[in-house]
Structure formats: structure tokens, C-alpha cells
Amino acid sequence: LKYQQNKLIANERHEAWESVARKIAHEIKNPLTPIQLIIDNLKKKYSELFDEKNKESFLEKIKTINKQVKLIEKLVNEFSDFARMPKPIFKKNELNKIIKDSINLMKTNDKDIDINFVSEKVYFVNSDYEQLNRVFINLFKNSIESLNEKSEKMGNFQKKINVEIQFINDYINIAVNDNGKGFTNSNPKIFSKPYFTTKKEGSGLGLSIVEKILNDHNGFIEFISQKEGAKIKILLPKYGN
């Protein structure tokens, strides 16, 4: 009964956030095109009217405005993506393969990070391959960003991500540990709330999308503070359960 209540609450919460994201995307996207056109016209019309010194300053300011417009466009696309998330197409998938595929993709982007994967055996889940793949890519990406931020502050160290699968109490338990900077907020539950982010250029929707996908898969996610780094625990029902 408690599980059903939690799932109902999560569904209602995501429906509300999807509605908000849809409205935000619509309201912000409309004025972006005329803003971009005006910027382009200003650049064309006035850049040749300045002397060399002032022209450089003018173009630099135009470049800054353009960069901010592109950032807003990126955020709008993320809002739209969150609002239009497709329904999962379920079939029997090998969980180990989904995780390995995600790890291999991340390793091509950052070869300096040691990603270790341990599993007692091969597990299968009733899942949408693309969506679960997206979950692990999102989580690994966050871990890598945390490790790189710590490296910038502390200098070089052995950057590690450990992924382990176990079967506990009728659920497949996936633990993702890293030795990065850890959770800076004292309440880890807030990380999956939409629009909460610790990044300078982020919408805070990444982990909300992760939570939404896992909820659709009858799974759970937990963010655990620890002395060094961060731990994320995912529970998924085994195929056939």
C-alpha cells in the first residue's frame, strides 16, 4: 500500500512539473527568434560604424548576448524534452549490457576516469533500453563532472566510479559510488527536484528525468551522503516480478 501511495505521489508530482515545463518552454521560446534577429541586424548595421577599438568592444558585447541567447535556447530545449518525455516501450533487456554500454560511451569522452563494474551474475529487467541507458549516462555524467571539479581544486588524484549490482529483497540493487566532491547540499532528496541545480549553466532537469524514468519502470532512486564522494542507489524489479 505504501509503495502504491509513493508511486501515486511521484506520478502527480511529475505531471505537475511537466505542465510547468511545457508552459515555461512555450513562453520563453516565442520571444527568442525576434531577439536573435535583432542581434544579427545590430551586428550587421553598426559594426562598421565604429573605429577599430570600439568595434572590438561592440562585437564582444554582441558575442556575450549571443552566448546568453544560446544558453536560454538550451534551457528551453531541456524544458521541452522534460515535458514531452515519451512513454517507455517495455521489453526484456539485459541490465548488465545497458550499464556496460553506458560506461563504454562515457569512457570514450573521458579516458582519465576509472569506471569499475561488478555484478554477481547477469540480470534482466522489463524496460525501455533507450530510457534506462539515459538514466545511467546521466548519473555517470554527474559523477564525472563532480570528479573533474574536485580535480580542479585539489590537483590530480585517481578518479574512480564503482558500479555494483546485487539482488536484495526481490529487487535488483544498483549502487553507483564515486570519489568526487560529494553532495554539497545537506538534503540529498532535493537533487531530483526540477530546477534545482548546483551548476552555473544547468536547468536542474537531468535528475528529474532520471527519477521520472525510474518511476515509470517501478523503480526507486536514493541519493546518499558519505564521507568521501557520493553514492546513488537504484532499485529495479527483476524481469518476471
Model region roles, listed by residue range:
Residues 32-70, 90:
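Histidine phosphotransfer helical core of two-component systems
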Residues 85-88, 124-127, 198:
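Conserved micro-motifs of the catalytic ATP-binding
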Residues 183-194:
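Short conserved segment of the HATPase_c
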